[in-house]
């Protein structure tokens, strides 16, 4: 079965939870001059422009905002904090639709045998093209946001969609997928079990899988998903340029299977080469498969097992995507593993910002990078990491708020009721 060859272990990071608010490891393989075949495949020349051309045609498309948290930056002693707010992406509350829509577009273009030109969305919706394509059912597994994006794209183009979720997926996230006409199947176990189940059933039912994670023999579509994500990176660079900034010095990006993180890493490696920003990958400590893969030090992706019980539902993945791993193992500098209270703190800080800063609605998976940055900037026990990352007054830091309020009930428990509180030893000294 896919990815069955990955070594699996239960993480023992929580044994050190009393020492630091997060665990970190430096990537010894992050050579700034090194390239890899996976990166060349991921981002061939011109692919970001093709993705942006498609996304501009989507109903309701506009660039999501890039927000400056200048007040918080001053408080933390850094030059600037810039947040790409994907909670405002196409009214879908997440960036994920960028990947799912582009993967479907590329699949249909290939199925139609069109290589010498790009298709328009109007052409894809035309009766002539639909008659040629016939009945297609797209299928995927999700923790919520990717499935919602695929369901939206399938509905926009008039195709059926089946989405598999694991048993811990919240009812609001399931309803959000069903709102776009998809059939939802709930699978016992974790997200990784849902991936295995949809792979099995898709073969039996003739469905076409649109997954953001790869496995042996299935790489084209996950590659297209990651290419779709580069639209938001191109938007960021355009928006930063409008503020007189050529590039961020540091990027903190969250990771589940690693698809978005690899797209970010690959985009900046291709754009800036050795001058690329310092990149930190941020994961839940209970689902830190990329952190664990770096820690093992053998150059191979490693899985983590267990229930993956974290409030960061969108990042609760035990199996890294091999395609993403090939890029991240060479292009990411640091890997951080965070307990849930780090994400909860980020949610509250976004929602009740420093005076003068804009407020941002951010879900658990969207906010963990802000929480991690705050501890990194202020906690004395992380001084070595600050030094290694060269974080200081000249730093221009990029964060991506990958999701908004995708589970309103849990959001209120954390933000309104103070759920998942910060332990006393890790609270700010006021």
Q: What name fits each language-model region?
A:
Residues 3-430:
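PLP-dependent amino-acid enzyme catalytic core
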């Amino acid at each position: 079965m896919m990815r069955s060859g990955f070594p699996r272990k239960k993480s023992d990071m929580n044994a050190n939870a009393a020492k630091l608010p997060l665990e970190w490891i430096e990537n010894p393989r992050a050579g700034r001059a090194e390239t890899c075949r996976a990166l060349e495949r991921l981002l061939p020349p011109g692919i970001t422009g093709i993705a942006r051309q498609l996304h501009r045609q989507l109903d309701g498309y506009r660039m999501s905002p890039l927000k400056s948290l200048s007040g918080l930056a001053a408080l933390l002693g850094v030059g600037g904090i810039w947040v790409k707010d994907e909670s405002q992406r196409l009214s879908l509350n997440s960036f994920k639709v960028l990947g799912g829509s582009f993967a479907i577009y590329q699949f249909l273009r290939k199925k139609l045998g069109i290589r010498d030109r790009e298709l328009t969305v109007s052409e894809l919706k035309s009766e002539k093209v639909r008659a040629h394509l016939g009945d297609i059912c797209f299928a995927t597994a999700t923790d919520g946001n990717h499935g919602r994006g695929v369901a939206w794209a399938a509905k926009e183009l008039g195709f059926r969609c089946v989405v598999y979720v694991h048993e811990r997926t919240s009812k609001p996230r399931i309803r959000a997928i069903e709102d776009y006409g998809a059939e939802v199947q709930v699978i016992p176990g974790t997200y990784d079990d849902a991936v295995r189940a949809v792979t099995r059933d898709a073969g039996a039912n003739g469905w076409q899988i649109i997954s953001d994670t790869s496995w042996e023999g299935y790489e084209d579509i996950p590659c297209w998903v990651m290419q779709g994500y580069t639209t938001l990176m191109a938007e960021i660079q355009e928006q930063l340029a409008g503020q007189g900034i050529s590039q961020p010095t540091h990027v903190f990006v969250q990771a589940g299977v690693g698809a978005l993180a690899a797209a970010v890493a690959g985009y900046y490696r291709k754009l800036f080469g050795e001058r690329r920003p310092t990149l930190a990958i941020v994961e839940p400590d209970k689902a830190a498969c990329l952190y664990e893969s770096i820690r093992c030090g053998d150059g191979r992706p490693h899985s983590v097992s267990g229930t993956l019980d974290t409030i960061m539902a969108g990042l609760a993945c035990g199996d890294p995507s091999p395609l993403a791993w090939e890029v991240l193992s060479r292009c990411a500098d640091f890997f951080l593993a965070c307990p849930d209270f780090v994400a909860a703190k980020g949610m509250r800080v976004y929602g009740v910002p420093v005076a003068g800063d804009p407020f941002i609605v951010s879900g658990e998976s969207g906010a963990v990078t802000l929480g991690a940055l705050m501890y990194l900037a202020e906690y004395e026990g992380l001084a070595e990491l600050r030094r290694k990352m060269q974080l200081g007054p000249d730093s221009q830091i990029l964060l991506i708020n990958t999701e908004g309020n995708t589970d309103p009930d849990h959001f209120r428990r954390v933000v309104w009721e103070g759920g998942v509180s910060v332990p006393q030893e890790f609270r700010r000294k006021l």
